[in-house]
Each structure stands twice: as structure tokens, then as C-alpha cells.
Design a protein with these regions (language model features):
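Charged, compositionally biased interaction regions
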Residues: 1-151
């Protein structure tokens, strides 16, 4: 269900520390390195985006920086996203992604910008407001989850 977290390995010996990344890139509010079983290191970044194209610029700078070459995939999210909550990260990823617009490839590495887009970035529609379930609704869903989705 929506409460389950993905299991990840924590062997980040080749990867830079979040502190080092945040020192080099001041616009990064939080970051987390995931070592997936496929041995592809993924960096989740909560980016304080204040200008058009900032997500793309961050990704390009990150992928060009030799100190971070152990990270094969970088995903830039909005600064308010709790990167510790994998369910929320995946929800943001799949709902904000436009593969034609948001994928950047560099030397076998991938950057994905799923930050909110500004009109200057070619996004002409209104970006939808975020909604948050009340604690009452969450409790109701939790009570019915096993009835709705048999595991």
C-alpha cells in the first residue's frame, strides 16, 4: 500500500556524501543516495527552485562534475518534497514527468527534472495545486486497505 517503503541497500562507499553534494550545490535543500539492487546509484534531490530552467541547469552541472561520477541517476524534485518518503517521491515523479521534456543524458548517466515548470520553460498550463489527505481520510483508507487490495 501507500505506507510501504522500498527496500534499498546502504552501501554508499563509492558515492559522495549528501553533505558534500549540498556544499557544492547551495540550491540543494536535501538529498539522499539510494543504492538499488541493480547497482545503479540514484540521487534524490530536493531542489530550492527559484528560477526557470534551474532544475535542468542543476542536473547538467551535477552530471558534469567529476566528483559525483559514481551517481548514475539524479532526480531533481521540488524543495518541499520529503525525499525520505519514497511513496511521495514516486508520486511526484510519475505525476510531474514528461519524458520529452525532463530527461537529460550525459555519458551514460541520466538526469530527470520533475520540478514544477514555469511558463518560461514552455509550460503553458496551470501547474495543479497539491492536495493533502486529512488525517481522518488517511485513517479510513488504512482501515480499508487490506479489504481493497489483497496481498
Amino acid at each position: 500500500g501507500y505506507k510501504k517503503e522500498a527496500s534499498t541497500s546502504t552501501d554508499n562507499s563509492r558515492c559522495p556524501s549528501p553533505e558534500k553534494i549540498m556544499t557544492v550545490f547551495e540550491e540543494v535543500q536535501a538529498c539522499k543516495v539510494l543504492q538499488l539492487q541493480a547497482r545503479r546509484s540514484v540521487l534524490l534531490v530536493a531542489l530550492n527552485k527559484t528560477a526557470p530552467h534551474q532544475g535542468k541547469q542543476f542536473i547538467q552541472s551535477f552530471l558534469d562534475h567529476s566528483a559525483f561520477s559514481a551517481i548514475e541517476i539524479v532526480i531533481a524534485l521540488e524543495g518541499h518534497v520529503d525525499i525520505e518518503n519514497i511513496s511521495t517521491v514516486m508520486w511526484k515523479f510519475f505525476n510531474n514527468l514528461d519524458p520529452k521534456r525532463d530527461f537529460y543524458f550525459e555519458a551514460g548517466r541520466l538526469g530527470i527534472d520533475v520540478t514544477q515548470k514555469f511558463p518560461e520553460e514552455g509550460y503553458q498550463q496551470n501547474w495543479p495545486d497539491e492536495i493533502e489527505m486529512t488525517s481522518e481520510i488517511k485513517t479510513q483508507v488504512d482501515k480499508r486497505w487490506s479489504d481493497l487490495f489483497k496481498e
